[in-house]
Design a protein with these regions (language model features):
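Membrane-embedded beta-strands of outer-membrane beta-barrel proteins
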Residues: 62-66, 98-100, 138, 174
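Helix-adjacent hinge/juxtasegments
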Residues: 91-115
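Short loop/turn motifs that connect adjacent beta-strands in outer-membrane beta-barrel proteins
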Residues: 23-40, 54-55, 70-80, 105-111, ...
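Transmembrane beta-strand segments that form the barrel wall of outer-membrane beta-barrel proteins
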Residues: 42-51, 77-89, 112-121, 153-158
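Residue-level signature of outer-membrane beta-barrel architecture
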Residues: 66-70, 102-104, 142, 156, ...
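Outer-membrane beta-barrel "beta-signal"
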Residues: 58-64, 167-180
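Cleavable N-terminal export/targeting peptides
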Residues: 1-36
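Solvent-exposed loop/turn segments connecting transmembrane beta-strands
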Residues: 50-60, 86-97, 124-131, 161-169
């Protein structure tokens, strides 16, 4: 229980005190109204199935993620911005992470790949072989309003063979993103 409280407090601290890539702000036009849009950060709440491809270790999960598009870097693949979050499974396995993402907008459809290193605690869940794990994620979402998206995402969590074993875990989630 103390670990869960620590994780919740730590993530809340990260949300309030985000580490900056850059303090530059890009003028972003709202795709609905054509006016300046200052809603460039978001909170993503998600729920789904952790390690759905392993019948013996499958578990429900719930998580939250902060996406901050105010802090970005222009690169060859687009604007990369920070993302921070955590999830916990029904077996008390938890993962806290921070990394990068980029967003590609196709009308109302959004494709958001991300890469996030983090710390994994197995609890009563699957042993992934290391405390240090890496999450590769792709999210497909649809704008349902000026500041809300609904979507689905898939991720793979793995230790990149840093541990003695590397079973990995594949997960899917349903996402609700609120921009502010």
């Amino acid at each position: 229980m103390k670990i869960k409280l620590f994780v919740i407090y730590f993530v809340a601290y990260l949300f309030v005190n985000s580490v900056s890539f850059t303090e530059e702000k890009d003028s972003q036009m709202n795709s609905y109204t054509g006016i300046l849009d200052d809603k460039t950060s978001g909170l993503n709440v998600y729920s789904g199935m952790f390690d759905f491809s392993d019948d013996g270790q499958r578990a429900s999960l719930i998580g939250i993620e902060h996406q901050n598009h105010n802090l970005y870097r222009d690169t060859l693949i687009g604007k990369i911005s920070p993302v921070t979050g955590f999830f916990i499974t029904e077996n008390n396995a938890s993962y806290i992470y921070t990394g990068i993402e980029t967003n590609y907008k196709l009308g109302r459809l959004n494709i958001t790949p991300s890469f996030t290193p983090g710390l994994y605690a197995k609890g009563d869940g699957k042993d992934l072989g290391s405390v240090i794990e890496f999450k590769s994620d792709v999210q497909l979402s649809y704008d349902i309003g000026e500041s809300m998206n609904l979507g689905m995402s898939y991720n793979h969590v793995s230790n990149a063979s840093l541990g003695d074993k590397n079973p990995g875990a594949n997960s899917y989630m349903f996402n609700f993103l609120k921009k502010f």
